Amino acid sequence: MILVIGGAGFIGTNFVFRKLQSTSDKEEIVVMDSLTYSGNLDNFKSIKNNKFFTFIQGDITKEEDIENILKKYRPRSIINFAAETHVDRSITSPDIFIQTNIIGVYNLLKHCLNYYQTLPQESNEKHQPENFVSKKTFRFIQISTDEVYGSLSSSEPSFTEDHPFRPNSPYSAS
């Protein structure tokens, strides 16, 4: 099972649709989203009855939401798309960016570490159950933004993953 945090936003929704359309593996996807200004439950109208899709309204700034979803679903992978976005908003109202993008992600990481520590190293069974999760198979993926690299003029080469971070707004710094 894959837990997609912040999956009702633009990028998260597109990831969910792409994953559900994948023919190679059919794995349950649970989306947790707080449905703030950028999250839209209507994005999922066409898949709301898909047996591999579940939506839970929750917030990474609320530790009990994270604890509950980890206990109930025991994900193999967690992909965090949740973030307050938009450079201009981060300059005029940085508090919500700090709350979600820093404290919320910290809460998520803290509870994921606790969850990870409860997982077995790996299975001794030759044929593991389909939903088996171990320390060896668990993954946490944090989605970010190209804004972390700062500004780029048209004469400069494209950024690569090796470029140093040079955030220039509360959004990109968070």
Enumerate the language-model features and the residues they cover.
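N-terminal Rossmann-like NAD(P)+-binding domain of SDR-like oxidoreductases, especially those catalyzing
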Residues: M1-S174
